Design a protein with these regions (language model features):
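Extended, charge-enriched "interface" segments that sit outside catalytic cores
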Residues: 1-56, 60-62, 66, 72-84
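Generic, well-ordered alpha-helical scaffold segments in large soluble proteins
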Residues: 13, 37, 41, 45, ...
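Extended, Lys/Arg-enriched charged tracts that mediate electrostatic binding to polyanionic substrates
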Residues: 25-42, 141-224
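Long, structured ligand/cofactor-binding scaffold of large enzymes
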Residues: 46-50, 57-130
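Residues forming anionic-ligand binding surfaces in small-molecule and nucleic-acid pockets
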Residues: 86-108, 241, 246-269
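Glycine-rich phosphate/pyrophosphate-binding loops
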Residues: 122-124, 128-147
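Carboxylate/His-rich catalytic cores and anion/metal-binding grooves
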Residues: 218-256, 275-294
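Single conserved hydrophobic/aromatic residue that forms the stacking wall/gate
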Residues: 306, 310-315
Length: 315
């Protein structure tokens, strides 16, 4: 892509999203416009890559992990899409440094350490080597924490990364998965078939949002599907009666699952929350994998076309 072509795409995006010209756009607006351009291109590339993989019968790989340390996406996305030089020159003509735009992006609050970095590298590696790969994790509202030292003491603050990072995410509420907690399981056999009935359960809806990882030199694209926990409905009856706390408690309990990466587990409540997070991720992801397979092939007889890996190298 030429500098002139990229400059037009960038200006069109700034106009449609913010109604501004490049010459007066803020650095935050330019960052978001560039992110949207990359996201759209990667989404289109992923659709083509996925269709080709299904058409050739390639095995699809799914990687589940509680964290993905993705870092910042703009620089790598522009580079892997082959747009870095064009973007740099287009901005330079407006006397804007691309490096200064990179600084507008927060680190994604989806990972913390080596486990998450390993997971992110697997996604990048699968995309670059043209393996049809999908990562699954939780869309944490807050990263683990931001550290600040005051008078020699550490103070922890919430890592509110979504205001700057959500531009990379595409929500798909139509593909939500119901995850059931608690309740009772009843099972019986009838004419050789095993029937399971789940009663008195509490439902939490797993709402997926997707972000993409472009492989180097445009070879392949990996998808990271992130689950956000939501209550299935709102208790309007309690709210109408003035029982506001009761009405909100169901929503708060559900949304707590995707609130914070690695909640403190030095107490029983924290241990329970971590267990709920792990079950939520597993149940939503397996449900999504099975549903996608049935939509594509109409049968589970060829489920060996899927390969699922749970990242358990770290306790």
């Amino acid at each position: 892509m030429t500098t002139k072509e990229f400059a037009k795409i960038l200006q069109d995006k700034l106009t449609s999203e913010y109604g501004v010209d490049l010459s007066v756009a803020s650095h935050q607006q330019i960052y978001r416009a560039l992110a949207l351009i990359c996201r759209q291109m990667m989404s289109e590339n992923h659709k083509k890559f996925q269709s080709k993989a299904i058409g050739t019968g390639s095995k699809q790989v799914y990687y589940l992990c509680m964290e993905f340390l993705m870092g910042r996406s703009l620089k790598m996305s522009l580079f892997n899409l082959g747009l870095n030089d064009a973007a740099q020159k287009a901005l330079a003509e407006a006397d804007i440094s691309l490096d200064s735009i990179y600084e507008e992006e927060p680190d994604a609050g989806l990972g913390n350490g080596g486990l998450g970095r390993l997971a992110a590298c697997y996604l990048d590696g699968m995309a670059t080597t043209s393996i049809c790969g999908t990562g699954y994790s939780i869309l944490y509202e807050y990263g683990i924490f931001k550290q600040k030292i005051v008078d020699g003491w550490q103070q922890e603050r919430a890592d509110n990364w979504l205001p700057g990072g959500q531009v990379w995410l595409k929500s798909h509420p139509d593909q939500a998965v119901e995850v059931r907690f608690d309740g009772e399981i009843h099972e019986n056999w009838d004419h050789g078939f095993h029937y399971i009935q789940h009663t008195n359960y509490n439902s939490v809806m797993a709402i997926p949002s997707d972000m993409y990882v472009q492989g180097y030199d445009g070879k392949g694209v990996a998808k990271l599907r992130l689950w956000q926990a939501k209550a299935p409905d709102f208790d309007m009856s309690s709210f109408s009666l003035g029982n506001y706390n009761t009405a909100m408690s169901k929503n708060a309990s559900a949304e707590l699952i995707s609130k914070v990466l690695y909640p403190n587990d030095n107490h029983v409540e924290g241990k329970i929350l971590r267990l709920r997070q792990q079950y939520f991720l597993s149940a939503a992801s397996i449900g999504d994998i099975v549903q996608n397979h049935l939509s594509t092939y109409g049968t589970l007889e060829n489920l060996d076309r899927k390969s699922t890996r749970l990242n358990s190298s770290h306790a």
